[in-house]
C-alpha cells in the first residue's frame, strides 16, 4: 500500500508581509540614517558651544 502524503500549511500563513505593502513614505538607506544622525549631533554640539554667544 502507498503511504498517504499530507501537505503542511504554507509558512507564514495569515501573517502580514511588510515588503508587499506599497507605502508612500520617504525611503532612506541605513547609511543615510547614520549620516543624518551624525549631522544632527554635530549641529547640536555647535549650537551648544556657539549658541550662548549668539543668543545671549
Curated annotation (Swiss-Prot):
Entries under Pfam families matching the protein: Sec61_beta (PF03911)
Cytoplasmic compartment segments: 1-29
Stretches of the chain found on the membrane's Extracellular side: 50-56
Gene Ontology terms describing biological process: protein transport
Signal peptide feature range: none
Keyword ATP-binding belongs to the record: no
Keywords per UniProt: Cell membrane, Membrane, Protein transport, Translocation, Transmembrane, Transmembrane helix, Transport
UniProt membrane topology term: Single-pass membrane protein
Localization of this protein: Cell membrane
Superkingdom: Archaea
Function: Involved in protein export. The function of the beta subunit is unknown, but it may be involved in stabilization of the trimeric complex.
NCBIfam families membership: PRK01253.1 (NF002318)
Family: Belongs to the SEC61-beta family.
Quaternary data: Component of the protein translocase complex. Heterotrimer consisting of alpha (SecY), beta (SecG) and gamma (SecE) subunits. Can form oligomers of the heterotrimer.
Name of the protein this chain belongs to: Preprotein translocase subunit SecG
Organism classification: Archaea, Methanobacteriati, Methanobacteriota, Thermococci, Thermococcales
Amino acid at each position: 500500500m502507498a503511504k498517504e502524503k499530507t501537505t503542511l500549511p504554507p509558512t507564514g500563513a495569515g501573517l502580514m508581509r511588510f515588503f508587499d505593502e506599497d507605502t508612500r513614505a520617504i525611503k532612506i538607506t541605513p547609511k543615510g540614517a547614520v549620516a543624518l544622525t551624525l549631522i544632527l549631533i554635530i549641529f547640536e554640539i555647535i549650537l551648544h558651544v556657539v549658541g550662548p554667544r549668539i543668543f545671549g
